[in-house]
């Protein structure tokens, strides 16, 4: 393979590793992801149980095109059909005119709410079947000075109740009877609740309740230009929302009828004023005609004059009819509209015909002219008068039988199901949200806090790796016992080197033992210090098992627990903590008798002793140096377990007495920056760290080999 090909392959492999690492990181944190998702799902389930359900009621109304107006129907029948003005009607339904009457009719400005525990109280009441308890208040007023006070109604039983406020007001009332005290008036029509149940009574402004109705009311047209409107109203009370929607449709219908009736009423008032005047003019015309006939001795008209007279009277009648039509059509159209222009053209034609007839009358003898004029005035007046009488009767009938343009097709009905919350959707959405957030959290944590993922990552920065110890499944199982059955039992359990000597982690520690044999050849003494980067990385585990493995080679090993704050090696090895390191350094114990034998041959332990107030000062004493010198002369290896260097300075103090120093870092937990900072602290104190032990390497979901560790198992045959 050429160099260029190798580089290309390396880049490709690196890209694949990056993608695989992301997937692997999520898979490794699967229990955390699943746990987080389960919490989100549980919260969603709890919410759906306790959230207040919202119901929906719907109704259907139809806008009939110009119902009840024959004139407009006649006009529109001659024109193209004009679609109903649905948009205008929708705004009318949502107007304060309609909704305000609904608020007044149903006393919606008075709200009575049952007092429950915040957040979950209402849901609990529903689960217990007590959510239908109610108090019906039809009247509630209070002085302006009490507008900011909170009024509470307490059910006393026997149809009695007590009304109190946080301002000191208190009064008792009886159902069905008005309560009046200090300017506060209330009338309770019904109570359906247990004694001692409390309700909050609130008074809202009419405008505020209208706005609330507008927010919960939806009006849409069904289809295009159908004139059929669908009304939907949402709320918490199934019965109340049905009543509200029925009231809205009823008030909408009534206002439409009232508007039509008002129009007819105004026309009737106008006719009532005009009829006497028309009758008076008719009487005058009749008197003049009679007087002229008496004066001329009953002059008869010839047939030609009679025909002209009839034509003129007929034209006058038609002109009067057009006047009525123009009054109606002017409300709908401008003069530029085709229908209006047609009417004006017809009027002009009649007026032209009338002018011609007037010319023929002018050619007649004077007596005939006068008789024609007087007779025309009488007959035209009679026709006008009869038309007005007919119109009056017609308007009276219209006023009495007005149905309006609106028809309620479907009265309001509450849908059986719950509109919201949609339980399945909320739970599913919460599961998806929890899954996404947990995965993002895992990836962000991995991105911003990337632990050491391979020995090569350390070696590339010039840091020697003496051993890579895999995570022991056996030890992991013992750790679970710690969680379930308590720390004490866990700490008194067997070492991995004793309980499962063929474990891969012990094999790695044996490899470390071999490496230490050569690493300590040039050391100034046989003292080996093991420290850690940070707490909870398995330093004591490595130290204790390393001591056990070395002691199995028939070398005498002494383990000194220098973690006088949190050391627990004595519990791990099953020895007591009497006359430990702190006691020796404080002068309370003898160095010669401080080492305690363990259950493992050639393996002795000096426990931490009682927790002192000044562990760092004790380690700096000359007596600690004497202890190290004594131990070095009597044992093949002195192993010192110290606290993590990033936590306290004890390791820097002890390191001056050790010929060899190794540092433990945990795989995928400690970062490269932490390791470098720890090494820098040792350098500042003149201590050379030989190398790092990478502990608890586990098989990642992206493949174990990507991190420089190959798993083999080699066991003896059992026969």
Curated annotation (Swiss-Prot):
Is tRNA processing found in the keyword set?
no
Residue numbers carrying Phosphotyrosine: 568, 707, 709-710, 712, 714
Transmembrane ranges, per UniProt, are: 31-51, 424-444
Pfam families, per database record: AAA_31, GNVR, WZC_N, Wzz
Q: What does the entry list under GO cellular component?
A: plasma membrane
| Pathway(s) annotated for this protein in UniProt | Glycan metabolism; exopolysaccharide biosynthesis
Q: Which InterPro entries match?
A: AAA_dom, Bact_polysacc_biosynth/exp, GNVR, LPS_length_determ_N_term, P-loop_NTPase, Wzc-like_C
Gene3D superfamilies given in the database record: P-loop containing nucleotide triphosphate hydrolases
Catalytic activity, EC: 2.7.10.-
Entry protein name: Tyrosine-protein kinase wzc
Lineage from the top down?
Bacteria, Pseudomonadati, Pseudomonadota, Gammaproteobacteria, Enterobacterales
């Amino acid at each position: 393979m050429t160099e260029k090909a190798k580089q290309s392959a390396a880049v490709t492999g690196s890209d694949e590793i990056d993608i695989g690492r992301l997937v692997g990181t999520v898979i490794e944190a699967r229990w955390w992801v699943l746990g987080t998702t389960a919490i989100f799902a549980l919260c969603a389930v709890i919410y759906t149980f306790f959230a207040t359900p919202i119901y929906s009621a719907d109704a259907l109304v139809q806008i009939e095109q110009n119902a009840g107006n024959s004139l407009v129907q006649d006009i529109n029948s001659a024109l193209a059909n004009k679609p109903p003005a649905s948009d205008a009607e929708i705004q009318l339904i949502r107007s304060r005119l309609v909704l305000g009457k609904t608020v007044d009719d149903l006393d919606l400005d008075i709200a009575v709410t049952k007092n429950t525990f915040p957040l979950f109280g209402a849901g609990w009441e529903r689960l217990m079947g007590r959510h239908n308890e109610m108090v019906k208040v039809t009247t509630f007023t209070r002085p302006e000075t009490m507008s900011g006070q909170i009024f509470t109604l307490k059910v006393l039983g026997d149809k009695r109740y007590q009304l109190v406020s946080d301002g000191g007001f208190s009064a008792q009332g009886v159902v069905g009877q008005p309560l009046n005290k200090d300017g506060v008036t209330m009338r309770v029509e019904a109570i359906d609740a247990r004694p001692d149940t409390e309700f909050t009574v609130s008074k809202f402004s009419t405008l505020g309740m209208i706005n609330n109705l507008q927010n919960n009311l939806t009006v849409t047209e069904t289809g295009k230009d159908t004139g059929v409107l669908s009304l939907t109203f949402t709320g918490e009370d199934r019965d109340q929302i049905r009543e509200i929607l029925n009231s809205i449709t009823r008030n909408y219908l009534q206002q439409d009828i009232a508007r039509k009736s008002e129009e007819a009423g105004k026309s009737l008032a106008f006719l009532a004023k005009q009829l006497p005047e028309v009758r008076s003019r008719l009487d005058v015309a009749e008197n003049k005609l009679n007087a002229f006939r008496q004066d001329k001795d009953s002059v008869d008209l010839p047939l030609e004059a009679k025909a002209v007279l009839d034509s003129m009277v007929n034209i006058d009648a038609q002109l009067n009819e057009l006047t009525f039509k123009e009054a109606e059509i002017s409300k709908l159209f401008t003069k530029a509209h085709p229908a209006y222009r047609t009417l004006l053209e017809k009027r002009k034609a009649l007026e032209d015909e009338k002018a011609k007839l007037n010319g023929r009358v002018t050619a007649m003898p004077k007596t005939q002219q006068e008789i024609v004029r007087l007779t025309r005035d009488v007959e035209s007046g009679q026709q006008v008068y009869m038309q007005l009488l007919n119109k009056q009767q017609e308007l009276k009938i219209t006023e009495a039988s007005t149905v309006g343009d609106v028809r309620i097709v479907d009265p309001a009905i509450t849908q059986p199901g719950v509109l919201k919350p949609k339980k399945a959707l909320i739970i599913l959405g919460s599961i998806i949200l929890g899954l996404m957030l947990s995965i993002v959290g895992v990836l962000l944590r991995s991105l911003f806090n990337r632990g050491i993922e391979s020995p090569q990552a350390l070696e590339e920065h010039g840091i020697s790796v003496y051993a890579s110890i895999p995570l022991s499944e056996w030890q992991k199982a013992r750790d679970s016992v710690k969680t379930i059955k308590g720390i004490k039992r866990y700490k008194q359990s067997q070492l991995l080197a004793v309980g499962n000597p063929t474990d891969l982690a012990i094999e790695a520690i044996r490899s470390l033992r071999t490496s230490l044999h050569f690493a300590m050849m040039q050391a100034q003494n046989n003292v080996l210090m093991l420290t850690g980067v940070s707490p909870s990385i398995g330093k004591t585990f490595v130290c204790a098992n390393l001591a056990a493995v070395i002691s199995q080679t028939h070398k005498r090993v002494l383990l000194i627990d220098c973690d006088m704050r949190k050391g627990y090696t004595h519990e791990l090895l099953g020895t007591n903590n009497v006359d430990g390191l702190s006691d020796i350094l404080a002068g309370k114990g003898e160095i010669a008798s401080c080492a305690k034998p363990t259950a493992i041959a050639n393996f002795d332990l000096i426990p931490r002793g009682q927790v002192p107030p000044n562990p760092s000062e004790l380690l700096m004493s000359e007596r600690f140096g004497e202890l190290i010198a004594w131990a070095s002369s009597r044992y093949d290896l002195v192993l010192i377990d110290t606290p993590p260097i990033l936590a306290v300075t004890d390791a820097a103090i002890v390191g001056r007495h050790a010929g060899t120093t190794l540092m433990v870092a945990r795989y995928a937990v400690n970062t490269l920056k932490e390791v470098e900072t720890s090494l820098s602290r040792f350098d500042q104190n003149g201590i050379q760290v030989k190398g790092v032990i990478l502990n608890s390497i586990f098989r990642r979901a992206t493949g174990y080999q990507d991190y420089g560790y190959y798993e083999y198992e080699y066991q003896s045959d059992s026969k």
